[in-house]
Amino acid sequence: MIIAIDGPSASGKSSIARELGVKLGYKFISSGYLYRIITLIAQKFLMSSCDFISEDRLLNLILENDISFNDSSFFLNGENVESQILNDKIDFQVSFYSSYVGIRNIVNKKLREVVKFSNDNYIIEGRDITTIVFPESEFKIYLDASVKVRALRRYKQRNGNETLEELERTLKIRDDVDKRKQYGKLKLSKGVFYLDTSYKGLDDVCNIIIEKFNLKKVRER
């Protein structure tokens, strides 16, 4: 069983997917975290965070590094790097690198292989999860929220290291890039359950999703 969660950056996908995993006993995977790790790999081999690296060079660097994840933790060469990939420098570049078709193919293949060779149930979140990676998943969700709310959430997560104006501007740019991607663009897929999380708490959102999920299972019996 796969529950696929899609939506824009900072709409609550990771937090909600983690919590749903706990409540339902499903394993959690974030494709966004994988793209962030790849962006970290690129940054480690660049002199300046304002520079970018070619797709071919980055593909080779990925092969030279070990990316892994388990129990909701994400590793680069055996080191838990979650604290290193949630910052403004990664935010600034991750959309650029995730637009490379070759990079998306690597991440999508890795996600599909994990599910294919496992008997576990999964909650997988990320942009294009419901449209490209797992379009036939049993339950598809699209989480959304206003830019102002998303900026405020990220501001609280980052302990005020960036201003609300900076975060809002970054998110608007990110949305524009994600919606214009030739491959894996941000969009609603057919049959998705749309939920605006702007003024809802974590527990409220999870309860709404679980209720909808259970109702769907009853109807399909």
From Swiss-Prot:
Taxonomic source organism: Borrelia garinii subsp. bavariensis (strain ATCC BAA-2496 / DSM 23469 / PBi)
Alphabetized UniProt keyword annotations: ATP-binding, Cytoplasm, Kinase, Nucleotide-binding, Transferase
Protein name per the record: Cytidylate kinase 1
InterPro entries, sorted: Cytidylate_kin, Cytidylate_kinase_dom, P-loop_NTPase
GO molecular function: ATP binding; CMP kinase activity; dCMP kinase activity
Catalytic activity: CMP + ATP = CDP + ADP; dCMP + ATP = dCDP + ADP
Annotated EC: 2.7.4.25
Main location: cytoplasm
Residues noted as binding ATP in the record, renumbered to the chain: 7-15
GO cellular component terms attached to this protein's record: cytoplasm
Subcellular locations according to the entry: Cytoplasm
Spans traversing the lipid bilayer: none
EC supergroup of this enzyme: transferase
GO terms for biological process, alphabetical: pyrimidine nucleotide metabolic process
Superkingdom of the source species: Bacteria
Record-stated family: Belongs to the cytidylate kinase family. Type 1 subfamily.
